[in-house]
C-alpha cells in the first residue's frame, strides 16, 4: 500500500511535469498586490513546478480580462467575481478585505449625498466593488462616467464631473487636492452588514483542475507569509511599479490592504463576501449563481 505522503509527492511531481507553459497571472501595480505577489513571481516560494507570466494592469482591466477568460489566475474585484464565479474559483489567500479601507465618494464642494441624484459621478470601472457599493447605497444613482482611477480626483477638481468614487492610494491623498469626503462607502457597508468590506480577491480558472488550483493556493499563501515576514524584500519591485507614489503613501497602502484576511479569508471574510454577493443578487446587479466560491 502506498502511503499518503508518497501519493502526494507523486501528484505534485505530475503537476510540475505537465505544467510546461507558464500560467498567466494578473495583478495590479498597486503596492498591496506587488507586495504579495513578489515572492511568487520571483521564485522565493515553492511553486511545485508551476511558472507564471505576470501581467500588471489596473483592476478594471483585470476584471474585463477575466470576464473574457483571458487570464489563468488573476486579481479581480469582488463585484466582478459575481459575474465570473462559474468559470473561476476564489482562492483563500491574496484578498484585499478589511475594515476602514473602503472606497470614498468625494466632491469639490461639500454637498449632501441626497443631492447627487441626476449628477455625474466618476467611477473606476463598471465591475469594481466601488460601483457595486455605490449602487447598493443608492439604487437611484445612474449617471456614471468610467475613467481610470488615478484621473478621478482631477476630474472632480476641475468640474468635469460632480463627484467621484476614489479607491487605492487616493484615500490617502484626496485632502491634498482640496476635495471633500461626502461618504465613506466602506464605513456604510460595515454599519449595514456588521462585516468587513470585501474589495478584491484572487481567482483561478476552474478548468485548471483541483490539483493545480490547490498548488497555486499553497504557493500564494506562502508568498503572502513570506512578504509579511520580510516586508523590505519587495521594496524595489513595489517602487518599480508605483514610481509616482512616495514612501509614506506606499507604506500606508500596504498597511491598510494587507492584513490577516490577505493570508486567509477565514470564516468572517467568507461571510462578508457571501453577504455582499447575496445583496448584489437581490438587487439584480449580478446574476444568480449556486456555484460555490471555492473549487
Q: Where on the chain are the PLM-derived regions?
A:
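N-terminal amphipathic/basic-hydrophobic helices that include classical n-h-c signal peptides
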Residues: 1-18
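A structural signal for short loop-to-beta-strand junctions that line the ligand-binding cleft
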Residues: 19, 23-24, 87-95, 120
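Bilobed "Venus flytrap"/periplasmic-binding protein-like clamshell domains
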Residues: 21-42, 103-162, 169, 271-274
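A local structural motif
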Residues: 45-55, 137-147, 286-291
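Beta->alpha turn/N-cap motifs
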Residues: 58-60, 69-82, 148-149, 166-172
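Hydrophobic/proline-rich hinge and linker segments of small-molecule sensing/allosteric domains
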Residues: 90-113, 190-207
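Pocket-lining segment of extracytoplasmic ligand-binding domains
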Residues: 149-240
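Secondary-structure end/capping motifs
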Residues: 209-279
